[in-house]
Amino acid sequence: MPKSKITTEGSALPQSSSSATNRTPVKINSEGTPKWYIAIMLGLMLLGLLWLVVNYLAGESIPFMQELGPWNYGIGFGLAIIGLLMTMGWR
């Protein structure tokens, strides 16, 4: 059962001090993300995608990719995931 706003003594509960009129404004850092951060973020996502596409299309004819075998998927997805995780820091 919900509690009423009046206490057992009959006096009303005190108002909280966190109302919008009592709050002081906080300055938010309005600087955007540096351009190099965005370039690295997009570059990693595209590099991961490119790695997977090249592995799929020509992986058997490229010697070092043939030696890596299934690790190519880990490398490609790893690069793409790092780029995607970087999007959380983008402003």
UniProtKB/Swiss-Prot annotation:
Main location: membrane
Pfam families to which the protein is assigned, alphabetical: CrgA (PF06781)
BP term (GO), one: cell division
Location of the region described as Disordered in the Swiss-Prot/TrEMBL record: 1-28
Compartment(s): Cell membrane
Bilayer topology: Multi-pass membrane protein
Entry coiled-coil feature ranges: none
The organism's place on the tree of life at top rank: Bacteria
Keywords of the record: Cell cycle, Cell division, Cell membrane, Membrane, Transmembrane, Transmembrane helix
Transmembrane segments: 38-58, 68-88
InterPro entries the record matches: CrgA (IPR009619)
Keyword Phosphoprotein: no
Biased composition (Polar residues): 1-24
GO cellular component: plasma membrane
Keyword Cell division: yes
NCBIfam families reported for this sequence: PRK00159.1
Family: Belongs to the CrgA family.
Biological role: Involved in cell division.
Family annotation (HAMAP family): CrgA (MF_00631)
Protein name as catalogued: Cell division protein CrgA
Name of the encoding gene: crgA
